[in-house]
């Protein structure tokens, strides 16, 4: 809590007032001493912590005859180039984090299945190798009841293997193109944290 000396306009805390009056015994709770007034707190103004700071100024006596805390926003940099450099430096870790999140989502979806013949087919590395093997087998693909991502099954065939291969290749290309566009948007934005990186992705399996 802050108090203002109504004569000198000096702002002081309880501890500072006690220290200035070592021979005075104050009760608990601490009363407003004579010659002082309680300063009601107010919210700090909005400011950019990269280029600005905020500091208390002399409290103001309101029309209600109460004192209120006042703030002042102060520019850190007087030179525009220094300010621009500080802003640019502050955006580097933000862009890096956003781009890492984009790549992580791209890779998650890459291994999160493709929809073929109304079935979600696994696209993890092992499954991709198996389907590639079936494509290479051509007409010799055995008819197997293949378990899909939702627990149901589908019968393997040459046509299915080709369709899965095509769908997987399309997914990969679409994911990489979309991730690249998002990264470009993040890198170009003066407010990279505001770029929406969660929507617009190609659909993958989201659970039964």
Question: Where are the predicted features?
Answer:
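A preference for well-ordered globular domain cores
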Residues: 1-208
């Amino acid at each position: 809590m802050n108090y203002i000396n109504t004569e000198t306009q000096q702002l002081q805390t309880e501890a500072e007032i006690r220290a200035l009056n070592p021979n005075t015994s104050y009760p608990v709770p601490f009363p407003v001493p004579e010659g002082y007034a309680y300063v009601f707190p107010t919210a700090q103004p909005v400011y950019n912590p990269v280029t600005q700071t905020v500091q208390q100024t002399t409290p103001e006596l309101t029309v209600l005859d109460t004192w209120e805390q006042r703030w002042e926003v102060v520019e850190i940099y007087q030179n525009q180039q220094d300010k621009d450099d500080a802003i640019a430096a502050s955006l580097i870790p933000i862009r890096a984090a956003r781009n890492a999140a984009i790549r992580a989502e791209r890779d998650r979806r890459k291994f999160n299945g493709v929809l073929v013949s109304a079935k979600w087919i696994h696209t993890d590395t092992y499954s991709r190798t198996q389907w590639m093997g079936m494509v290479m087998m051509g007409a010799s693909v055995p008819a197997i009841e293949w378990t899909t991502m939702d627990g149901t099954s589908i019968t393997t065939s040459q046509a299915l293997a080709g369709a899965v291969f095509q769908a997987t290749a399309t997914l990969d290309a679409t994911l990489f193109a979309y991730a690249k566009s998002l990264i470009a948007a993040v890198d170009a934005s003066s407010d990279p944290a505001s770029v929406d990186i969660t929507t617009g992705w190609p659909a993958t399996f989201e659970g039964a």
